[in-house]
UniProtKB/Swiss-Prot annotation:
Mg(2+) binds at S18. Its EC number is 2.7.1.71. CDD domains: SK (cd00464). This is Shikimate kinase. GO terms for molecular function: ATP binding; magnesium ion binding; shikimate kinase activity. The keyword Zinc does not apply. Substrate binds at D36, R60, G82, R139. Keywords: Amino-acid biosynthesis, Aromatic amino acid biosynthesis, ATP-binding, Cytoplasm, Kinase, Magnesium, Metal-binding, Nucleotide-binding, Transferase. SUPFAM superfamilies: P-loop containing nucleoside triphosphate hydrolases (SSF52540).
Amino acid sequence: MNPAPNLVMVGPMGAGKSCIGRRLAERFGLEFVDVDQAIVDQVGSSIPAIFEQHGEARFRQYEAQILQALLEQDNKLISTGGGAVLDPRNRERICARGFVVYLHVSVPAQLTRLARDRNRPLLQRADREQVLHAMAAHRTPLYRQVADLSLETDHLSPAEATAQLVLRLAAQWRMSSTPA
């Protein structure tokens, strides 16, 4: 099975990490944990409220603390926030304690998927498309750096993406458990 203690989903907002992650967790018998939701639960405020009251830097501190605590456990499917890879310590921990799946999505697909979403503080601006392009330019190399497996989700439903990942993960894990 999974050669790492946990399965970790990374990728930009709108890629499907939470939706697909829940499905994969159920399929593989893992406990699903959304890092953003864990932050909300621990802090007792919404993500927009945390950004407004404490700023992005404090949010990133909460994120790093919660991610570290989750990665110290086993048998979790951890859906990270899109910016979790910005912290080098997070990247190191993710790679050390997780098999990492990178879900990629294009900016046009993100704009469609996130059109009505008001819980993304970094997108509460008129220039959403430019912000997403800038984030992609900065974060995509970091997602690729930590990824053990990648999947383009633009034209896949959550069910299709899950089915593809189940097959690819099973094949990948079989290969990694085969004696050399």
